[in-house]
């Protein structure tokens, strides 16, 4: 975690104050408003567990806050329920304290990390304290805010990391509570949960400001690495500069790499279908790694950054000026195919768009010497030199990157063993007019690799990349085995009648052997479309389209929107339904539905990767494999493109 000298000095002073005042609490919060989204919350929890930190679930608690910062806390579910019913503290075990700022300048905002370090003063109060007794005399009239907190604590060597799911009294735009007098004035349990992460510095007898500060920065850095999903942290200001440089190089704000289509039967049959790509007509094949698709962008200094499809920027801490202002396409792999997986850091390059100093090579054919077919009777095209191919340029780029001792390490703590390893994918080339591509595909499938692969990518040897950013490369095709052939759906949980927030829970018998009785929730599955979906309009009673009421924008461009999944070929009336049994956490009693492979809780309105098993009963055929954190994050920022699969992609996968 890089800090400016002024920031470091301010933190040191706050730590020094904290050491000299035992009643002070020094804590760090994350997010612009002290909150993070559910996806980030889960990502941090996963990182902490992967690093070996044990989570200690705590009892649910209800905190009642007054405008004067007096906090009453009730523990245990039974006591909380009793208060919610009678709105009185009488006869209930509670603790009370006053918590406020220690000094007028008691907080430091690290805006580049959306992090706030603050010193608060806590003072426990007795039940017979005059202030407490005075509050109780007018308790029904007192303005209050309620926070129901479910918390997990991680002990991290001298700091405690608290992760909390909170349902609270609503807030005004100013951030102040919308105060209430009775718990029943607002049904707090129906409010959407918020997610909070705090790092609290713990007192030690031998603390010095320097030692305690290192401990704090280490704990804060650990959380930030979970938030940024990367070991090497990046400041917000640096991210803005990188995206500006990327825009200057590519002339777009979009992800420059193309989208590809799913391989279908007509793409490999012996009898050609007019205007249909066929992998027998001069294609190469490589493996499809199970990683994060990223552009590898090298800025004018030679610093390498990875940029994912959501335009999130990841710093590598590596520099090679010989490759300045270049752009490659690849997959960032972070785990091996061992059981359980082990962490690795590999960026596997499979294409190149711009070589050093921004030289555009995207219009080159992929294979050296490959040429596009010409009409019968026309003169054969000139064969380009080997260097006028993307495969040649790709290999040259990777060779230059790893030349001699490799790139220069620019970040303290990064070592040759822990730095990002950059390598080129291995390609096997088929010849046009025969079945050699199938032998090449077999070689790819049987080759041993340290990372998990979930399919094959077929690329035409002679074609250039699409000129437009984020365009579909219609001739580039992906194939996945049946168990990995998946669709990324937007999932929306079916709600109780009359409610917009409460999920509908059904008790029923799951069809099949055994007739198991289960409580389950139902997910509705959505894909993206530019067209009006007739089934969606009829079943959901939407307005019918007409000339003055269509899905077109003011400029006549169709709106890309979620529609219920309705396959046209091989129809299944339950294709857009996914029923999942409810699981219960033995530690907290929390109930949720979860993915099968990664065992992650599934939140409403997230992107979930699902596989289809026709052998299961109707409604139970979709198997959720994992929550697509990267795509869900983009969706929550308001970006719909490249999140849920499009109607066409989902249909291709369904038909394949």
Task: Give the label of every model feature segment.
Residues 20, 26-28, 40-42, 85-94, ...:
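Nucleic-acid 5′ end/cap handling module spanning
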Residues 158, 165-167, 201-205, 310, ...:
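Residues that form ligand- and interface-recognition hot spots within folded domains
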Residues 162-164, 171-174, 207-210, 295-297, ...:
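Short helix/loop capping segments that flank catalytic or ligand/cofactor-binding pockets
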Residues 1-253:
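Phosphate-end processing signature that detects enzymes handling 5′-triphosphorylated RNA
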Residues 190-192, 203-205, 228, 238-243, ...:
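Hydrophobic, conserved cores of late-appearing folded domains
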């Amino acid at each position: 975690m890089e800090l400016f000298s002024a920031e470091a000095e301010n933190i040191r002073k706050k730590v020094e104050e904290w050491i000299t005042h035992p009643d002070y609490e020094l804590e760090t919060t994350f997010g612009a408003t002290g909150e993070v989204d559910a996806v980030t919350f889960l990502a941090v929890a996963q990182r902490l567990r992967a690093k070996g930190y044990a989570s200690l679930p705590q009892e649910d608690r209800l905190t009642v806050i007054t405008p004067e910062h007096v906090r009453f806390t009730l523990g245990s579910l039974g006591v909380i329920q009793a208060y919610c019913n009678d709105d009185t503290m009488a006869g209930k075990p509670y603790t009370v304290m006053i918590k406020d700022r220690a000094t007028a300048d008691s907080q430091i905002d690290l805006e580049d990390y959306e992090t706030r370090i603050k010193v608060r003063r806590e003072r426990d109060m007795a039940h017979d304290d005059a202030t407490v007794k005075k509050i109780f005399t007018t308790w029904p009239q007192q303005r209050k805010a309620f926070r129901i907190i479910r918390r997990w604590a991680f002990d991290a060597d001298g700091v405690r990391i608290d992760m909390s799911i909170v349902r609270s009294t609503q807030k005004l735009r100013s951030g102040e509570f919308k105060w209430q007098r009775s718990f029943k004035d607002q049904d707090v349990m129906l409010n959407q949960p918020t997610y909070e992460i705090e790092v609290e510095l713990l007192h030690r007898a031998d603390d010095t400001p320097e030692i305690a500060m290192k401990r704090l920065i280490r704990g804060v850095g650990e959380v930030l690495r979970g938030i940024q999903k990367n070991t090497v942290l990046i400041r917000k200001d640096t991210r803005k500069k990188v995206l500006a440089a990327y825009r200057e190089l590519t002339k777009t704000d979009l992800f420059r790499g193309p989208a590809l289509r799913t391989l279908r039967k007509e793409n490999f049959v012996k009898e050609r279908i007019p205007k249909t790509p066929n992998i027998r007509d001069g294609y190469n094949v490589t493996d499809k790694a199970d990683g994060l698709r990223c552009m590898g962008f090298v800025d004018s200094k030679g610093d390498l950054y990875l940029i994912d499809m959501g335009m999130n920027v990841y710093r590598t801490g590596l520099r090679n000026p010989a490759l300045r202002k270049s752009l490659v396409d690849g997959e960032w792999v972070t785990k091996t195919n061992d059981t359980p997986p082990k962490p690795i850091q590999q960026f596997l390059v499979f294409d190149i768009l711009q070589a050093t100093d921004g030289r555009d090579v995207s219009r080159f054919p992929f294979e050296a010497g490959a040429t596009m077919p010409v009409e019968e009777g026309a003169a054969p095209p000139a064969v380009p030199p080997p260097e006028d191919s993307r495969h040649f340029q790709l290999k040259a780029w990777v060779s230059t990157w790893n030349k001699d001792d490799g790139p220069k390490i620019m970040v303290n703590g990064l070592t040759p063993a822990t730095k990002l390893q950059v390598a080129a994918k291995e390609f096997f080339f088929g010849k046009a007019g025969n079945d050699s591509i199938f032998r090449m595909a077999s070689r790819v499938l049987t080759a041993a690799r340290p990372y998990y692969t979930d399919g094959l990518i077929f690329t035409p040897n002679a074609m250039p990349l699409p000129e437009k950013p984020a365009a579909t490369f219609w001739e580039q095709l992906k194939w996945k085995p049946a168990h990995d052939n998946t669709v990324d759906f937007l999932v929306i949980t079916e709600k109780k009648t009359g409610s917009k927030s409460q999920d509908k829970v059904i008790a029923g018998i799951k069809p099949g052997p055994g007739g198991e009785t289960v409580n389950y929730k139902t997910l509705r599955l959505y894909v993206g479309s530019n067209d009006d979906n007739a089934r969606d309009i009829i079943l959901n009673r939407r307005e019918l389209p007409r000339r003055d009421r269509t899905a077109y924008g003011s400029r006549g461009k169709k709106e890309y929107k979620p529609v219920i999944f309705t396959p046209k070929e091989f129809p299944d009336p339950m294709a857009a339904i996914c029923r999942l049994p409810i699981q219960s956490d033995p530690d907290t009693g929390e109930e949720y539905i979860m993915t099968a492979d990664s065992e992650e809780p599934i939140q409403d309105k997230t992107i979930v990767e699902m596989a289809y098993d026709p052998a299961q009963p109707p409604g139970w055929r979709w198997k959720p494999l994992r929550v697509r954190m990267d795509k869900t994050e983009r969706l929550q920022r308001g970006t719909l493109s490249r999140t849920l699969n499009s109607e066409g992609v989902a249909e291709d996968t369904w038909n394949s």
